Amino acid sequence: MKKNSLRRLIALVVLALAGTPAFAAPALISNPNVAAEKIDAATLKAVFLGKKVAWDGAGRVTLAVLKGGPVAEEFLKGTVDMSASAFGNHWRRLAMTGGGTAPKSFEKDEDLRKFVAETPGAIGFVDSALADASVAVLTPAP
């Protein structure tokens, strides 16, 4: 009886772990017309906090973000030192005071990648496994 219970427990643990979604590190992506292979940390933070609204020579910045999830949490924590909910609150505050337009937000990485690929001046982040040739992958510099 104990052997069967142990086998069931092991089987449940294996199934639970198999169902856990894995993700790669976030990748910073932009529309190919954004002429910057590297972007420094201060500029990147200014872009995602709405302080930099135009690219040098490439028009207006269009920000695209994931609504939540591990990729969003990791990227936002590393870039602007905020959780996804704090980041959302920051943008709601800016929008209510007339200080900016909230970023376009997406549930799925694939939808965000497609939006960035098709929108001049767009920048966002996706699971690095989903970054493809339709977008430019930027390297944040320290």
Predicted segments, located by residue:
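Sec/Tat signal peptide C-region and signal peptidase I cleavage site
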Residues: 18-25
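Bacterial N-terminal signal peptides that target proteins for export
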Residues: 2-11
